[in-house]
């Protein structure tokens, strides 16, 4: 039974989540554009919104790009200037800082959403569920740091890296690379994949519409009517 669950969650489940993530996002964009928004509640009440939102977004963006580089970049691309042990230490320190920022900001946003009557009235169940899951995932991520510290050579981290790269390159037997990995890492992986599974059904879809063109657009020319 344990072997079956291991194969399902770490060999099959990643592709289920990825399929729902991409296909669900595409279908929602095509058929539900009126729901494709961040639904900001800042106009309802600004108290605490700016600081909590900034902390949360800075932290979670740092975590996302840190995981993107750390998990998916082939080792040979950085081995000549960044040893595995140094990479793990950097991940623990910077990841820990970003995790704390995300946790503080996310907890503030969730508390505001639950206790502010005006904000609560415009909140949906998926809003509350996805924020709660993100906070739990953040706690799990922070709780992996002591386990990583037990392997200063980065060997535990490289098992996770090997698993992630095996998944994205469609190699079989990916679950075998997680043999001996602490349970908290396994739980962190499953919940992380579940977030991608739920992504198309929440307001997280606004991530796809990040205004990157703002940095390259032409300056607007404003002429007064005189």
UniProtKB/Swiss-Prot annotation:
Its cofactor is heme. The keyword Transmembrane applies. Pfam families: Nitrate_red_gam. Residues 31-48, 114-125, 200-226 are cytoplasmic. Its EC number is 1.7.5.1. Disulfide bonds: none annotated. One of its GO terms (molecular function) is nitrate reductase activity. It is an enzyme of class 1 (oxidoreductase). Its main location: membrane. It is found in: Cell inner membrane. It catalyses: nitrate + a quinol = a quinone + nitrite + H2O. Residues 1-4, 72-83, 150-183 are periplasmic. Heme b 1 binds at residues 57, 206. The keyword Heme applies. GO terms for cellular component: membrane; nitrate reductase complex; plasma membrane. Binds 2 heme groups per subunit. Heme 1 is located at the cytoplasmic interface, heme 2 is located at the periplasmic interface. Electrons are transferred from the periplasmic to the cytoplasmic heme. Heme b 2 binds at residues 67, 188. GO terms for biological process: anaerobic electron transport chain; anaerobic respiration; nitrate assimilation; nitrate metabolic process. This is a second nitrate reductase enzyme which can substitute for the NRA enzyme and allows E.coli to use nitrate as an electron acceptor during anaerobic growth. The gamma chain is a membrane-embedded heme-iron unit resembling cytochrome b, which transfers electrons from quinones to the beta subunit. NCBIfam families: narI. Dimer of heterotrimers each composed of an alpha, a beta and a gamma chain. Alpha and beta are catalytic chains; gamma chains are involved in binding the enzyme complex to the cytoplasmic membrane. This is Respiratory nitrate reductase 2 gamma chain. It comes from Escherichia coli (strain K12). The gene is narV.
